[in-house]
Regions:
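Conserved core of the sugar-phosphate nucleotidyltransferase
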Residues: 1-53
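Left-handed beta-helix
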Residues: 53-214
Length: 214
């Protein structure tokens, strides 16, 4: 049997060679293929399912097809590139920190598969005199006066003199004030970390500072 895991928990069994779905069961073992929650489905079948289950708020695709197992033609494509499933804040933190690894970057963004994104007319990041930045990804528009290491900074982040950012994800528009320290944390966009404040988590229990209420 060829097995694929759905969302890290469900296994889809395909009878070898005939592309017929034989069932879904829970549990995944090391060495089995994980379903990436991506699939191509017949437009007609998808529209039929929308009509059949219109009154339902949410329904898993495999639950919707459960009554048709045995007749649906299912085929697979093996993806061998970099994958980072994100289901928890720790997953999010770890997958972002992995972007500091050049091997992961090269695997995720190969030259032959470019990523096109929206352009922003912001100036390059500027490391001011007296600042120190090591092993970090710093986006355009940032101004660094303090110390940044092993971190990821979104656009237009300001790290003031005497502030320290270590092993952290700082999102767009944040200001880390003088003397503040942020470590093993995720700071959502447009936050201001007050002078002298310490935000510190651990790699296993990451601290999250949510977006300020408007």
């Amino acid at each position: 049997e060829l097995r694929h895991a759905a969302a890290g928990k469900d296994i889809v069994d395909l009878a070898d060679g005939n592309h017929i779905l034989s069932g879904v069961h829970n549990g995944v073992k090391f060495g089995e293929c994980m379903f990436l929650d991506c699939f191509v489905i017949s437009r007609k079948l998808l529209l039929d399912m929308f009509e059949w289950y219109a009154p339902t708020d949410y329904l898993d695709i495999f639950e919707a097809m459960a009554g048709d197992f045995g007749r649906i033609n299912v085929q697979t494509f093996e993806f061998t590139g970099y994958v980072a499933p994100i289901f928890t804040k720790r997953d999010y933190y770890k997958s972002n920190m992995a972007m500091l690894d050049m091997d992961v970057q090269d695997d995720l963004f190969p030259e032959e598969r470019t990523v096109k994104t929206k352009a922003h007319d912001t100036p390059p990041a500027k490391n001011e005199v007296g600042s120190r930045v090591t092993n970090s990804r710093v986006s355009s528009g940032c101004r660094i006066y303090g110390n940044v290491s092993d971190s990821i900074l979104g656009r237009d982040v300001v790290v003031e003199p005497g502030a320290t950012v270590r092993s952290a994800i700082i999102m767009q528009g944040c200001v880390i004030k003088t003397g503040a320290r942020v470590e093993n944390a995720i700071v959502d966009r447009n936050n201001v970390v007050s002078a002298g404040t310490e935000l510190r988590g651990t790699p296993e229990d990451v601290l999250v500072k949510e977006k300020p209420s408007e």
